[in-house]
Every structure is written in structure tokens, then in C-alpha cells.
């Protein structure tokens, strides 16, 4: 054979190389952008650091991250099924060493989390089945308050969400729903909702907060001045703190569940949450926070909704379960999170601080607003005194609607990506987390080093399709570990949950890398354009007359939540405080700007109460006299000063001082009715009770 003939490539190699070359360029771009974006975030953390340990960890993490990513690049090149004319150029010894190192690194990074997941699934029950076998009544069941903020929701969807809560297999007298409207207008949504709850529409006006009994459960319907979801939750918390002030003096079995207004709870969701947090055999009653399993639902099936469904199941039941086994989940989503109320109230003033007004730049905005769930979980992880107090409940389920269009999905994933990468940089540079959750943070760091390698599997599939390579010429071990282990889990999840479409996981394994590639590239380029090119001329700005939240809502309404000027948030907030003569309390935290990590003062603060001999529950640093006296920071009349409270630093006193009196007790519905309406309401309540099947609750 002549040299010219040896140099000729087979047709299938030419076709394969022309196709795979494009994919490889995309993979290289993804590899470069991920390392550039992560190093940029570490640099921002270094610049903003409040403590020398942050700077040291920023440098160490950046060096290790760059070194590992640089090693993985040649590993990926020599592992790819390239044509023989290319492969013969690589030195055989180098190829063997790199492939050996790469296989065992990837195998370890994929197998160890898989084993953590298996351990959690063996030791915790998975599925929508009830776990409490004794009879639950209003004495044995802990009280659960459900906070459901609502803003421009469809009335039917909102009522359906409320029904899913009160229809849970849980004593109705132990359920208290706080349905809070973000806006104090008596609009169509408000009126249609209260009508569905049995409230007459014949009244001329309604109190800001009304108590009503619906299907034997207590529902408090409130209207608060518009200020965003977090503001609405904060006002609701103040109301709960006032309503349950005396109850908390002698009880520590009150739990607060945050859900979205479009979430549908599974029938056994509440009792399974409570089982893990309070009622399981041998429970030490020190579980502080839990999230459940959020699955997607859709009105119309399509490729993107099916992919989202598989992503939700895999992300919830694998990734969060692994984190839970390593010591703590790193994201408590606002759509489904339960917390022990007595512990949460010690963190409330930090949790509800107006983080948007503390943003100095887009990095802060992405960290504290786009990724607020992760930032707040970081807060709780520092507040907890030990591991395994912030966990995943694999038997508490709820459904939420998936993104229906490609446009909405891209915007959602851009938010998630920017929130993830900024908070990940902050977590990896917090020495307190390395000390308290070493396994978790190490696993998170190593998983970040192998991100953006999923396109390589598509290249292997392409090699077989084009007959450029045979199966025995491919890295079968790598494929078996990366795809096989995950597919086995998805088959188990699908059978256990009867969601058989998740068995299509190999389709997601091949297709999803392209979606993830686009999400990341789009997110980085649009954020980079905003960071280095500056905002557009029509960007929303905060000012002395417009809050940061109003600027954010203006940008979201215009269709681009990054078209803002966060650099103006701090100055605008300071200008408003000066104009209102309210000082510069910085959202209640005594600082003017955002920080890289939660303050040291919250370290170990997120704890449950202990019971004293007198029957009172207290934290070690609280005054028993103040608890016995019932002091809890009641709202004073407008224009009066608050009396000093020995527990002021722990309770919600700060809110009413700073944000006004939201703690006005709700009025019972009967108190605002005339005699005729009251009789009609009582008849409706009786009829409602008869329509509900009330057998003995063996749960």
C-alpha cells in the first residue's frame, strides 16, 4: 500500500469527523466558559471578602479547580473515539496513564455519590405512602402553619392549592393556612378566592386579615401592601408570631411550611414531614428544616416537559438525597420547605432581610435574588449546630407546573444557573462550612470540576451510529458507570413512584447536555454582556422614589430580569432612608451592602428550644422572666415606642419597628357579619362538614 493510500481517510471517518468536530468545538467552548465563569465568581468573592479565610480559600479553590480542569481536558481528548489517523499521534504511554487516571476519577466521583444515595434510600422510605401507623388527633399531632403567598395567580389554581392542603390526611384542627395576598386591593382574585372559602361578597369592605373555617381547617386570609414575595412572607411571619405567642411558651411542636400558590400537596405530605421532624421512633426532635420532593405537572405534554419531569425526579431524589446523606441539602426551595418555628424565629430577621437593597453589583444580585433559596440555605447551614439537621424528606411530595415554552424554560434556567454558580463560590470559600460539613463541601467541589463533560457521551453514541468505531473500541467502563448507575436508579424511582416515563432517562442523558450547554452559554454571555458592556439605556433603576423590588419587577415585566442596575440599589435605599429619617439600618441587619457569607453572629443560632422544669420552652440565651411574662414583641400603637424586650435580638420585634405594624390579629369572619349572613354561613359550614367523609383517622 502506498503512502498516499495510507493517508486517505475512509468515508465514514470523514463524515464522523466533520460532525463530531462541531460538537467538540462546542464542548471546548463549554469547558472554557465554565472555568472562566467559576474563576470570575471566585475573584468577586476574593474582592468582597470580609475575612482573611475567605481570601485564602478563594485562592486555594481557584488553583485546585484550575489544576483539575486542566488535567481533565487532555483526559477528555484521549478518551474520545477519534479516527485512527488522529489517535496514532498520541503517545501510547501517555494515553494509558491519562485514561487510567480519568476512569478511576470519574468512577469515584460518580460511584461515591451513588452509594450515598443508595444508603439514604435504604434508611429512609421513598414514595407517597403514609408512614404514621397510630391515630393522629389534635392532641398527638403537631400544629402546622402553611404560608402561601399569592400574587396575580389564577383563582382556580389558588383554590386548588388550598384544597390540596386542607384535604391532607392530617387532623384539620392542627392545620392553619395563612393565605397572604401581595397587594392590599380587594381585586377580582381576592374576592373570588374568599367567595370560594365561604365568605359572603355582600360586605362593603373586608378587614386586612380574616379568619375563616374551611373544611374544618383554619384559614387566615390577609392582604399586605405590595412588596414582593419575601416581603409578603415576612409580614405573614409577624402575624403568625403574634397569633401563636402564648402557644409557643409551653410548646415546641409548631412547624411552618412555605409553599407556592400553584403547588399541589400530596395527601400524605404533611404527616410524612411531621413524622421525620417530630414523630418517628427515637426522634431527638432536633430536626430544623426539611424539603420534600417536588415533581412537575403539565397541561400538555411535549419534549421539554418530559425532560423537565425526568430532571425534577433525578435532581430531587438523587442529587438532594446525596447532599442529605453528606450532612445537609444545599438548597431549600421556597416551593416546599418545612421548618421548626421556634428555631426559625431566631433566624427570621436575617432570613427576611431585604437582600436586594444590599446588592452592589450583578454578582450580589445573582447571589441574593436569583439564587435566594441557596443563599438562605447557606444561612441555615451556618446557623445549625451540627450536621443532619437540614435534610430531605423522600416521602413528602408536591406538584408544580413545569415551564411550558422554550422561552420561559431558558429564562428559568438562566436564573438557576446564575444563582447556582455565585452561591457555589460563596459556599466553597466559607471555612465554617468546610469545618462542619467537610464531606458535603468536598463532594460539591469535586462535582464542579467534572461539570460540562456530558457532551462527550453524545460523541461516543455518534461514533457507533456512523460506524466509525465499534463498541469494543469505546470506553465501555466510563459509559457503564456514568449512564448505567443513574439509569438503574431512575428505573427504581419510576417503578416506586409509578412515573414510568422517567425510564426514558437515556434519552435525557443524550439530549439534555445540549440544553444545558445552551443554558450555560446563554446565561454567561447575557450576564457577561451586562457586566462588561453595562446596562441598556432602558434598564430599570432604583432611586429615592423607586425601591429595588420595584426595579426588579419592572425588568421582569419587560421580559429581561437582568436588565437592571443593581449598582444603584444601595445608594437608592440610603437616599430613601435619609428622606424618611429612618437611619441606615440596612434592611434590619445594620449594614449597607451585601456580604459574601452570613455573619458570624448567626453561627449556631438555628436551634430548637429546650423544655425547663416549669413547663416553659426556652433557648439557653433567653430570659425565662420574659417568656413567663409572655413578651414576644407585640406591635405598639402608631407613634409610640416599643418597650425594651430581653429577647429583642431573637424575635420579630425588629420588624414592626422597621416595617410597620403587620402583626394585627385577624378578625373572625362571624364578627363582621350581620345576623342573616351569619346564619347562612353556619348552614354552609354544617353542609360542608357533612360532605366530608370523616372516618376514624388511622394514619
From Swiss-Prot:
The Gene Ontology terms for molecular function here are: chitin synthase activity
Q: Which domain of life is it from?
A: Eukaryota
Could you tell me the EC number(s) of this protein?
2.4.1.16
Q: State the top-level EC class.
A: transferase
Sorted UniProt keywords:
Cell membrane, Glycosyltransferase, Membrane, Transferase, Transmembrane, Transmembrane helix, Virulence
InterPro entries recorded:
Chitin_synth, Nucleotide-diphossugar_trans
User: In which broad location class does this protein mainly occur, judging by the first location in its UniProt entry?
Assistant: membrane
Quote the Pfam families the UniProt record gives: Chitin_synth_2
Q: Where in the cell is it found?
A: Cell membrane
Return the annotated region ranges for Disordered: 628-648
Keyword Membrane attached: yes
Kindly indicate where the leader peptide sits in this chain: none
SUPFAM superfamilies, sorted: Nucleotide-diphospho-sugar transferases (SSF53448)
Topologically, how does it sit relative to the membrane?
Multi-pass membrane protein
Q: Which reaction does it catalyse?
A: [(1->4)-N-acetyl-beta-D-glucosaminyl](n) + UDP-N-acetyl-alpha-D-glucosamine = [(1->4)-N-acetyl-beta-D-glucosaminyl](n+1) + UDP + H(+)
> What do mutants without this gene show?
Leads to a winkled surface morphology. Impairs penetration in host plants and exhibits a significant reduced pathogenicity in Arabidopsis and cotton plants.
Listed GO cellular component terms? cell septum; plasma membrane
User: What is its biological role?
Assistant: Polymerizes chitin, a structural polymer of the cell wall and septum, by transferring the sugar moiety of UDP-GlcNAc to the non-reducing end of the growing chitin polymer. Plays a role in cell wall integrity. Required to successfully penetrate the host plants and thus plays a key role in pathogenicity.
Task: Give the family from UniProt.
Answer: Belongs to the chitin synthase family. Class VI subfamily.
Name the record gives this protein: Chitin synthase 7
UniProt organism field: Verticillium dahliae (strain VdLs.17 / ATCC MYA-4575 / FGSC 10137)
